């Protein structure tokens, strides 16, 4: 997977290239990062990449030409590696919400070109000509797209085969389909007792089925309390078992649903 980033601050991306899980994956050749500064594609002595907005208003707007030239250079470099043209994604508060599914889709692809905006915004003509999708992390505004781009990259790289030391680690992440799209359960490590708080007995039992049921119950409890819409989604997808539904009924103080495994007795004919 190759990631190209168009940014005024290429040095910010040393974090994902050199450190932690993403840094190790980069060193192993599981993915590559290439940063392109629009200032390198300007033609004036001041390397200007922004100007005042037409129609007035506060702030400055990033100019179309340097951005488009940077994108073309990135796509040409990809072509030189015999890679197909990549989607061009703009980090933007008006974009589609980036989630675990989008991260998995990116991890399964050849990569993309990320555009990190600054100032008041980007010239709309560049967006119309070059951008194929817009991505948002949520309903808030950052000073630039770099922090959002780092999150997009990190979420995808850790899903690459071999990126994590334990291949099953990503399968236990919150939102993963192996957890039925639910939130992850709490985690504990040594010491067994910390500030008078003990590790739950189920985790010390050594009984694998009991541990799995405890983790599933905690996942259901946490998801119901924090993200109830994920419960609805899991139910719609058919990802909840009868045991799950019984746990949820108990948590909500309602009567458990009938067991679908038990056939209803037919009334004798009169």
UniProtKB/Swiss-Prot annotation:
Enzyme class (EC, first level) = transferase
Keyword Cytoplasm in the entry? The reply is: yes
Instruction: Enumerate the residues binding S-adenosyl-L-methionine.
Output: 117, 137-142
Q: Which GO terms describe its molecular function?
A: tRNA (guanine(37)-N1)-methyltransferase activity
Cytoplasm: is it a keyword of this entry? yes
Record-level GO cellular component terms = cytosol
EC number in record: 2.1.1.228
The protein's UniProt keywords, in alphabetical order, are: Cytoplasm, Methyltransferase, S-adenosyl-L-methionine, Transferase, tRNA processing
- Entry's Gene Ontology BP terms: tRNA N1-guanine methylation
Q: Which reaction does it catalyse?
A: guanosine(37) in tRNA + S-adenosyl-L-methionine = N(1)-methylguanosine(37) in tRNA + S-adenosyl-L-homocysteine + H(+)
Compartments, record wording: Cytoplasm
Domain of life the protein comes from:
Bacteria
Identify the CDD domains for this entry: TrmD-like
Cited function: Specifically methylates guanosine-37 in various tRNAs.
What is the similarity comment for this entry? Belongs to the RNA methyltransferase TrmD family.
NCBIfam families referenced in this protein's UniProt entry, alphabetically: PRK00026.1, trmD
Summarize the subunit comment.
Answer: Homodimer.
HAMAP family, sorted: TrmD
What is the protein named?
A: tRNA (guanine-N(1)-)-methyltransferase
Organism equals Bordetella avium (strain 197N)
Gene symbol here is trmD
